[in-house]
């Protein structure tokens, strides 16, 4: 399993707008592509000083599945123009990690 991690930052004034864009358009668009090997996506958010940081964590079966999503140079960040319009800055490249262990909680 491969975890693809990416960070983007925006202003507090644009944070809710960006979150809605992710959840209502961008994530839906990714799901609608029906990429074989795409397992899901998480969205994290926190305030950092005068900015709001967002982190996306995508899970894929393999690097081949990541390439189906991002292209041959799979580390390049996939940032739609609508997102660029509300972000103040963002990672140009995503980080990829092998998921080596995963455990559930008590709940």
Regions from the language model: what does each represent?
Residues 16-18, 51, 66-68, 104-106:
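Short acidic, gly/pro-rich beta-turn/loop elements at beta-sheet edges
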Residues 20-21, 43, 58, 86:
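Acidic/proline-rich low-complexity IDRs
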Residues 3-9, 40-74:
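Short, well-ordered beta-strand segments in beta-rich or mixed alpha/beta enzyme
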Residues 12, 60-62, 98-101:
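Non-catalytic surface loops within mature trypsin-like serine protease
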Residues 14-40, 77-82:
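Short amphipathic alpha-helical segments
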Residues 29-34, 65-69, 80-85, 93-94:
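Glycine-rich loops and low-complexity Gly/Arg-rich segments
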Residues 39-52, 78-107:
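Glycine-rich beta-strand-turn "strand-cap" elements at beta-sheet edges
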């Amino acid at each position: 399993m491969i975890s693809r991690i990416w960070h983007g930052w925006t202003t507090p004034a644009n944070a809710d707008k960006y979150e809605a864009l992710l959840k209502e358009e961008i994530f839906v668009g990714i799901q609608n592509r029906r990429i074989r090997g795409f397992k899901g996506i998480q969205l994290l958010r926190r305030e950092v000083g005068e900015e709001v940081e967002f982190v996306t964590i995508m899970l894929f079966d393999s690097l081949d599945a990541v390439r189906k999503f991002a292209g041959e140079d799979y580390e390049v960040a996939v940032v739609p123009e609508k997102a660029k319009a509300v972000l103040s800055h963002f990672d140009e490249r995503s980080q990829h990690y092998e998921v080596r262990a995963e455990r559930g909680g008590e709940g």
